Amino acid sequence: KTEGESTDNKIAAAGPNAVPVDTRVVVNIPAFRMDLFQDGKLIKSYKIGIGYPEFPLPQGLRKAQSIIFNPPWTPPDSPWVATMKDVSPGELVEAGSKLNPLGPIKIPIGAPSLIHGGKPASKIGRFASHGCVGLTNAQVKDFAKLLAQASSTEVSDQAIASFLQDKTRTRVVKLHQAVPVELRYETIVVEDGKLHIFKDVYSQNTNTEENLRKVLDAQGVSFEDFSVAEKEKVLAALNAMSVHPKKVVDTKTSAKNVETKSTKNAKGENVVEIGSVTLKGYPAPVNLDTGNGTSVVAARTDKNR
């Protein structure tokens, strides 16, 4: 078992769209979003880059146990490495090198995945990595600081600045308390009173009516109680975000649905307002760091428990 892997299912949040009651990191892959909770309160949200479909982010429960400043990089024996110039599988790339893609900080969360910097803002909210959570350098510095605080780890701003100043020297800070990292794949999310349906980016066929009913049941809401108009709107949103969306044809000319090509754009989200889910669900982002130097403050904060 490598650093960051967890076999303790007792600390896994239960049910779809579960809101943590402890200190943990929650990554929802299709939403391109990472949240840091401290004692059940959402502290901050980040837009992220995710693994390409060929190198997807794994799912399940991991742990963050250390923060590594100025990490070196050992390229894996993988075809994508062969396409890089001046880099060979297994040959160490030193900290601070322009050939090192990890940026100033990495946080191991169990092989083969990391949370790390080094991504340009243009890669945030997109496929951007080979099985890792990708952040900009500014994002990862901010996240590392908050993660240390949330884990009761004593490391001052001055110490962090000192670590980062010498880009060629690697420093490892062990977290005082390991922090669970939950990697979710939820394309249907009841969030702050709205139904969010995200594109099925890894083609796992999750945008189905059956899955929708499970998500609603977890919130104490029945799909049968939706109005006809609400049902049509939600099912249309599910279809649009599915792996193989179908185009609804005028029933006067055809009684069937015909299949159309799925968009190649990884990004996608439909938001449907449903009266029966008001004040229910997962919290809206808090101070969402979009990676472009701006933060989006949540419209509601009373849900961020």
Regions found by a protein language model. Give the residues of each.
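N-terminal pre-domains immediately preceding structured catalytic cores
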Residues: 1-305
